[in-house]
């Protein structure tokens, strides 16, 4: 039997069928009326909702910016506590909210530090830490030791630069990743950690370690000083090393700042004061235009100097480099530096702390290198078959170039 698009048969229908159709039409009409009423109800609800949102928006616009942020966070928090099906990790939420604010402020160097992170930070800048006493780098899903602090638990256990750490507490480094592996190595003083190297397994007790961010050597009657970071003790140790070298008749120096991400302003200023003649070292300017100047005294070191830098040379290390260039005290070798021309301040919070970019800095020449960096006098890429941290002096072409310049 053929049907058209009405759904009604083309043949003659019986009276019973006609009644069914009438009943069906009546049902459709009732349903349509119900749907219409429901739609009107929904419309009323929606319009009422809009009126409520308008009121909220008006109150929102009248409040201060800080109040707005607090109000929105409270609203979201209440909604998630009422409706969210998952578990809330408030430690993580706190950190993400603060970091979200920093991202919104577009503070390139801003950072939130938890209570533990703050303690670790202050320990680091004061040349101490609790751990086993190694620095590591993550390569090819493994940890490689780049430095071992003297007399540390790692040093006493026979760990050497270049050693490969395969697992920590029976968990593979490849599965842990860099941060996970580092967190596993860290721990409370007096506790132990199990570490598997390529050729042996070790159980090491964590302890308070005095770190050193500076080391030195004499190569071909030239003083070589590697500065990894400008911490609270760097300037004093630097002066002691320089005095020792000069007492041995050394008057040519190489300062290796590759990988030096910066450090404390006071520390780098004191270090530069030892090297530079009387004059301006740096001036810093805050958001209100207030300027603070740091100057060197009349005493300074005479001699030839070379600074080696790379794209990881940043902040205080760039200030060190640029100040020596301004006074024509050093030749710079390497690749363009990072380009951090701001100083940050670590400010305590009720829980943890926050790093905020608070000043721009300018050297004697009036230069600020934010986003630009320093172009070396001699541009030279590092080229070697081995990573820099494992390279011998003879395998380091940038160091060899510095030695060549000073050996003339």
Regions from the language model: what does each represent?
Residues 80-144, 192-203, 211-216:
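Extended, small/polar residue-biased N-terminal targeting/export presequences
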Residues 127-168:
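Glycine-rich active-site/cofactor-binding loop and its immediate structural neighborhood
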Residues 139, 148-149, 168-169, 226-230, ...:
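Active-site-proximal beta-strand/loop segments in catalytic clefts of secreted hydrolases
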